[in-house]
């Protein structure tokens, strides 16, 4: 599959909750999720009383442009206590990229032990993915919100912009 440069669709990922996460402290740990899809990243930094301990409730949503087929979504969950962060575990998700398809399920997090080649189960995360195919069209300046001027030169001006539908920031 080749990259056409324009979005074929939009993948919405809801990070609902975690279950039995292997955290360092039930009262001090603030686990959060990081999603990576097609070189774009979402870092869940939502801190609430419900996102503490081994069974956090996040209820966060990220949106990604889909430009290529057969891409995986990488999920990592980290344990934050104060200024320290440690990887709890990760998994690879292969979302269904069919128009108006929604999948809601629990995904198991694994961590590779340093001294062995075995993966250790480190908890589960409840994820919902929804895919919407977009009509084929070229992006225009109206699809973006100007944030600030970054640079100026013989090449023209470079702006920092936010894509209106996914809220992603680009330069």
How should each PLM-predicted stretch be described?
Residues 157-171:
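Glycine-rich ATP phosphate-binding loop
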Residues 146-158:
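Protein kinase glycine-rich loop
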Residues 131-146:
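A short, low-complexity linker immediately N-terminal to eukaryotic Hanks-type protein kinase catalytic domains
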Residues 8-54, 81:
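Calcium-regulated, polybasic anionic-phospholipid
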Residues 68-135:
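C2-type phospholipid-binding modules
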Residues 56-66:
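Exposed aromatic-hydrophobic patches
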Residues 22-26, 43-47, 73-76, 84-87, ...:
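Intrinsically disordered, low-complexity regions enriched in proline, serine, glycine
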């Amino acid at each position: 599959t080749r990259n056409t440069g324009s979005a074929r669709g939009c993948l919405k990922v809801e990070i609902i909750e975690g279950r039995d996460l292997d955290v360092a402290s039930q009262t001090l740990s603030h686990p959060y999720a990081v999603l990576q899809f097609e070189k774009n990243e979402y870092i869940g930094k939502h801190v609430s009383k419900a996102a503490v301990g081994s069974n956090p409730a996040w209820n966060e949503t990220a949106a990604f442009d889909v430009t290529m087929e057969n891409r995986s979504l990488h999920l990592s969950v980290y344990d934050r206590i104060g200024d320290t962060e440690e990887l709890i575990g990760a998994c690879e998700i292969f979302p269904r990229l069919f128009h108006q398809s929604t999948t809601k399920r629990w995904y198991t997090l694994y961590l590779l032990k340093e001294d062995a080649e075995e993966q250790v189960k480190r908890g589960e995360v409840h994820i919902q993915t929804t895919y919407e195919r977009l009509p084929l069209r070229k992006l225009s300046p109206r699809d973006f919100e100007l944030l600030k001027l970054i640079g100026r030169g013989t090449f023209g001006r470079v702006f920092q912009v936010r894509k209106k539908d996914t809220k992603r920031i680009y330069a």
